[in-house]
């Protein structure tokens, strides 16, 4: 055990005397040694919303079996909808407290939210940069009923982390009557589908051992995006902590079915981790300050969040030349995930796909040159090219359509080989005029 758990309960009894009365936000000293109840957590998250409305929104994903709210703290710079370059903010999803007796997992979710909220209020440039470019969605306590009863299961005696609709089976202990038979898990999945379908990181927090585990749990096979997970592993080992175990959950923990991690990756297409923060369970407090005890884990979370931009394929066109019956495309992948089935589309003025290429792949942090058959491509006024690809290799990964700036497109004449910029409306007019003057036949329609 990484903390002195035997003394933890003693200090709780001596220092706090009893659980904090739910009438005010928890004092820092009590918060450092006494784990959250549903009541004290509710007070804390509501105080955040009241005190920091510019960066905190509080919503409920639904209610537990006993009617407790599943609070989600949404954290971002809400004064701006997008990033400064106009692109959408990245999204991160975090949950804690699937197992009510795994309190340090819940506390890590709380500390992660607290770091960015308080950092914003204290003008910390790291927190400010993240919140200007990222939305954090954090369900700190998923199983509030189990938390207050200090029980692993919910009040139906179901293990919520065996109840997701991904390789669910009755062979797992206490997996429920069927996938999503419990309100806590169905609410969590519904929140993912409503708010964070395009998230590029999902971390679910637990205790039981010490590991950062990626998919899969149901099979020993490596995930499709093993390159991404192995890059993250190597980067953390080199720059943060070389001893933190990071591997697939099936081998690193034990085989499991119906978990939120495998659902997040296999159904939602997120890069997912289970963060097992400690082997402690059932204790209600800690002798060591919680922020010190989870300092390394918080540093890992900060790393994962700060670099979320890289946790997908990020295709960037270096050049696009169209002439004759081919498009010569040069594209770089700035992300740490590969994409296996990208295509180039040509969109007409009405927004319809007029032409698309065959598939090509671009490996993580790599470069690809492709010669694409364009014999059926005719350019039209108002048309443009776009890249169509999946953000990761896993089948469930989100598809994206990213327009290519016309300044990157060159049109090659059949006879001279000259390269001209792709036509804007003005360029179309100029090109037609020049064509009339010079009596040149062009290979494409203006």
Write out the residue ranges for each language-model feature.
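Secretory targeting signatures
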Residues: 1-25, 408-446
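Short glycine- and acidic-rich boundary segments immediately preceding or forming the N-terminal edge
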Residues: 24-70
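C-terminal accessory segments enriched in acidic
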Residues: 26-34, 168-170, 174-418
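A generic secondary-structure signal
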Residues: 47-48, 78-81, 115, 190-194, ...
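Short glycine-aromatic motifs
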Residues: 53-59, 134, 242, 348-351
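Short beta-strand-to-loop junctions in surface cap/lid or active-site-entrance loops
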Residues: 72-87, 97
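Short glycine/proline-enriched loop/turn "hinge" motifs that connect secondary-structure elements
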Residues: 83-86, 151-153, 263-269
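Active-site/substrate-binding loop(s) of hydrolase catalytic cores
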Residues: 86-98, 102-226, 230, 234, ...
């Amino acid at each position: 055990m990484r903390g002195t758990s035997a003394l933890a309960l003693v200090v709780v009894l001596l220092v706090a005397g009893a659980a904090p009365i739910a009438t005010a936000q928890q004092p820092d000293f009590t918060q450092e040694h006494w784990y959250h109840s549903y009541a004290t957590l509710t007070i804390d998250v509501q105080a955040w919303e009241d005190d920091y409305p510019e960066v905190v929104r509080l919503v409920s994903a639904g209610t537990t079996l006993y009617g407790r709210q599943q609070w989600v703290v949404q954290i971002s710079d809400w004064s701006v909808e997008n990033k400064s370059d106009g692109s959408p903010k990245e999204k991160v999803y975090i949950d804690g407290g699937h197992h009510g007796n795994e309190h340090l997992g819940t506390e890590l979710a709380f500390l992660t939210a607290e770091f960015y909220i308080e950092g914003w209020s204290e003008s910390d440039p790291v927190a400010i940069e993240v919140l200007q470019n990222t939305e954090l969605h954090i369900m700190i306590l998923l199983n509030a009923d189990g938390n207050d009863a200090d029980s692993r299961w919910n009040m139906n005696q179901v293990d919520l982390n065996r109840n997701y609709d991904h390789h669910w089976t009755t062979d797992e202990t206490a997996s429920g009557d069927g996938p999503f038979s419990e309100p806590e898990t169905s609410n969590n999945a519904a929140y993912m589908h409503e708010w964070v379908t395009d998230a590029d990181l999902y971390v679910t927090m637990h205790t039981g051992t010490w590991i950062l585990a990626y998919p899969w749990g149901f099979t020993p096979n490596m995930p499709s995006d093993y390159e991404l997970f192995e890059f993250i592993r190597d980067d953390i080992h080199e720059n943060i902590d070389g001893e933190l175990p990071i591997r697939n959950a099936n081998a690193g923990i034990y085989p499991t079915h119906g978990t939120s991690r495998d659902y997040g990756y296999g159904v939602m297409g997120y890069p997912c981790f289970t963060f097992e923060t400690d082997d402690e369970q059932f204790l209600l407090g800690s002798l060591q300050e919680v922020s010190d005890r989870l300092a390394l884990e918080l540093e890992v979370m900060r790393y994962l969040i700060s670099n979320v931009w890289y946790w997908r394929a990020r295709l960037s066109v270096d050049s696009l030349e169209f002439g004759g019956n081919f498009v010569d495309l040069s594209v770089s992948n700035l992300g740490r995930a590969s994409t296996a089935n990208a295509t180039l589309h040509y969109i007409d003025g009405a927004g319809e796909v007029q032409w698309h290429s065959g598939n090509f792949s671009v490996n993580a942090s790599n470069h690809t040159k492709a010669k694409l058959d364009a014999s059926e491509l005719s350019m039209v006024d108002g048309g443009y090219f776009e890249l169509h690809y999946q953000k990761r290799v896993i089948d469930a990964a989100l598809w994206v359509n990213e327009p290519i700036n016309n300044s990157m497109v060159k049109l090659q004449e059949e006879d001279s080989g000259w390269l001209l910029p792709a036509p804007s409306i003005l360029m179309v007019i100029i090109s037609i005029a020049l064509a009339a003057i010079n009596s040149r036949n062009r290979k494409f329609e203006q």
